[in-house]
């Protein structure tokens, strides 16, 4: 599931008013090259970065141990994915206008990763 996140933590880490993540099954994820550097942004939530350049890679949460959320901008072939929902809309800055018809959630509920390791896709 591809999600726009409006939370305060994502805003500060991205330098933008919204971040975009894609959920994967944790068991199917692996780094191709190198090891990430971790930062605990809040209790139970770790964000990772490339040590060499500082690129934000993904976040993981103790609340959703079987899921990992990858920063969409780090992936190749971005046209493959399209956003499914907005999360943490309750934290959205007042002047940011959401201009689509995607589902909006006041918080984050997890369940963005499929058991087969592929990004979750809503049933047709």
Predicted regions and their residues:
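A short Gly-Trp-Pro
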Residues: 1-124
